[in-house]
Amino acid sequence: MLTDPDLPQEFERMSSKRPASPYGETDGEVAMVTSRQKVEEEESERLPAFHLPLHVSFPNKPHSEEFQPVSLLTQETCGPRTPTVQHNTMEVDGNKVMSSLSPYNSSTSPQKAEEGGRQSGESVSSAALGTPERRKGSLADVVDTLKQRKMEELIKNEPEDTPSIEKLLSKDWKDKLLAMGSGNFGEIKGTPESLAEKERQLMGMINQLTSLREQLLAAHDEQKKLAASQIEKQRQQMELAKQQQEQIARQQQQLLQQQHKINLLQQQIQVQGQLPPLMIPVFPPDQRTLAAAAQQGFLLPPGFSYKAGCSDPYPVQLIPTTMAAAAAATPGLGPLQLQQFYAAQLAAMQVSPGGKLLGLPQGNLGAAVSPTSIHTDKSTNSPPPKSKDEVAQPLNLSAKPKTSDGKSPASPTSPHMPALRINSGAGPLKASVPAALASPSARVSTIGYLNDHDAVTKAIQEARQMKEQLRREQQALDGKVAVVNSIGLSNCRTEKEKTTLESLTQQLAVKQNEEGKFSHGMMDFNMSGDSDGSAGVSESRIYRESRGRGSNEPHIKRPMNAFMVWAKDERRKILQAFPDMHNSNISKILGSRWKAMTNLEKQPYYEEQARLSKQHLEKYPDYKYKPRPKRTCLVDGKKLRIGEYKAIMRNRRQEMRQYFNVGQQAQIPIATAGVVYPSAIAMAGMPSPHLPSEHSSVSSSPEPGMPVIQSTYGAKGEEPHIKEEIQAEDINGEIYEEYDEEEEDPDVDYGSDSENHIAGQAN
């Protein structure tokens, strides 16, 4: 890129000598040339000359183009210094054309320039001087010295001039770079609108991030609050449970304290009253009754038993009955009434054949005297209350005859057997219970002794045989009646045909009544059947007559009404809460609840009834309701409806009540039996003393003419109870008619157990 400016000047000087005449020159001219060269050398020493080497990359460019920037640079650098320099520069510019014509202007190295200069110098000197050898040698020496000086100057000035060129080049490069950078920076910087848009986007992103952060903080706070509330709820629940446990513990402690107080009061009453507890024989013992009694804490050790005359095979388990138990059973009685009641009981117990209260010797242990016919009652599901004798006194059975019967139903569903009367003596009974209650010193005749083991065993065997025979005949009779009803009642509906069938049924029952007329009250020791002990009612059998359809015709149930829809779930709930509750009691509860409901509460169940009726009609379009005949029962060969049977039972109970009230008019003023013992259902599971002679019927002993005293145990409140039961059956009658399990069971007793229980008590 850089060229040497001195070589053209040298060529210029050489070429300036070419116009000399070929005819030669004088010595003066040579001297002028040499002096001029010296002056130029001195000027060149004073002013720095630029020695720019030729560059290879410019071989094809014209010489004027190469040296144009150099001349400009020399003008700028030198400035207005001397006219000689200006003259030299102008001379250089003026001789550019000549130098461009030189054949050596394209040389690219200093050696070529020197060779060219030497050749030209030689040619010029030889041509111009034309002198002898002396002049030639001096001119060559001058040229050589000039060349050497020029070379030295070039070598000397090159390191000084190069930095200035580099500075110029670097300045140019910086300017170009700045120009290019400024353009690129403008492109990168962009317009103000784009910057504002980007700023808006950044602000939007910042706002979004801020809102997201706030949301996260709010959610975190909510979670903290929720966790705190849950912890607070758990703490409150734990505190509530703890309080409930503490309350339950306090209640249990209070119950224990009350129980302890009751025990203390019982002991005080026993000590202060000096009243010996009752002693009631149990005839024969039942393991279930003993277990139930043991749970209540009233059972003595099993070894504590007696044998009347060493011949009674049935030991007596003794259970205490105290005034506290009586007070618990009858909270309405005061202390004075309790004293009177116990006085009456002891008076009934302490009647002796000789008129003495406690004066009989100990040797008469075998003579157990009962003022009434000695009987027992066996309950299948309930423990009879039994009392013990005082430990201080021996078991003086003759001084304290057993007159009170043990019967305490534990549940309203437990059927009761009639009493078995065993009389092995010859003397008839001369006095009754009212007489015994009236005076402790009343005399009664002995009716029998329990010292004949053979007689007792024989009576038991006869009772078992007759009961088994009656059961077999009853089964055969039931089969015949069922066949007759299924054949006849499905086809004949006239009164004449019904009368014929009823007479046939009565004839089938005559044999049973003739063969077992005195065995109605016989106790069944093997099975817990329900046997009526009255003379007029023998083995009442309640059954259902068959429907008015063929045996192969499938039974279509009626659609449930609103009450049945409601009672279905309610009955299930009650059974879950009380699994042992009887169906009749559940029906009473449901009936009373349904009556108490308002029409608004019943509305959804009526809607369900309409839906079920529509669905039933779509499923069975030809369905016709055929009501089954009313329930009937056989009483003494007569077929009676349930209402008639209940009316007969009610009348008989009323008669027995009147009979007992007439005999009790002259007695001591104590509470009636119905008040002392409210009812069989209310007394369920409560051990308490009883009045003598609970059950009685026509005796199955060899003396059928013996008078019988009836008790009014559970008499009060029976008629309202029966009315409520009939009413409940009227309400819920459809429920019982729709259950197939009741239809398929031929032995099911459709009278409620509470009805049978009342009937058994009255008879």
From Swiss-Prot:
One of its GO terms (molecular function) is transcription cis-regulatory region binding. Keywords: Activator, Coiled coil, Differentiation, DNA-binding, Nucleus, Phosphoprotein, Transcription, Transcription regulation. One of its GO terms (biological process) is negative regulation of DNA-templated transcription. Residues 1-30, 76-139, 369-426, 708-763 are annotated as: Disordered. The keyword Lyase does not apply. Residues 727-752 have a biased composition (Acidic residues). The modification Phosphoserine is found at residues 21, 370, 411, 414, 439. Residues 193-274, 448-515 form a coiled coil. SMART domains: HMG (SM00398). The modification Phosphothreonine is found at residues 131, 372. Residues 716-726 have a biased composition (Basic and acidic residues). It is found in: Nucleus. Residues 556-624 bind DNA. Residues 76-89 have a biased composition (Polar residues). Residues 99-109 have a biased composition (Low complexity). Disruption phenotype: Newborn mice display mild skeletal abnormalities. Mice lacking both Sox5 and Sox6 develop a severe chondrodysplasia characterized by the virtual absence of cartilage: chondrogenic cells are largely arrested at the stage of chondrogenic mesenchymal condensations. Embryos lacking Sox5 (homozygous knockout) and heterozygous for Sox6 live until birth and show severe growth plate chondrocyte defects. Embryos lacking Sox6 (homozygous knockout) and heterozygous for Sox5 live until birth and show severe growth plate chondrocyte defects. InterPro entries: HMG_box_dom (IPR009071), HMG_box_dom_sf (IPR036910), SOX/SOX-like_TF (IPR051356). CDD domains: HMG-box_EGL13-like (cd22042). It comes from the Eukaryota. One of its GO terms (cellular component) is transcription regulator complex. Signal peptide: none annotated. Induction: Expression is dependent on SOX9. Transcription factor involved in chondrocytes differentiation and cartilage formation. Specifically binds the 5'-AACAAT-3' DNA motif present in enhancers and super-enhancers and promotes expression of genes important for chondrogenesis, including cartilage matrix protein-coding genes, such as COL2A1 and AGC1. Forms homodimers and heterodimers with SOX6. This is Transcription factor SOX-5.
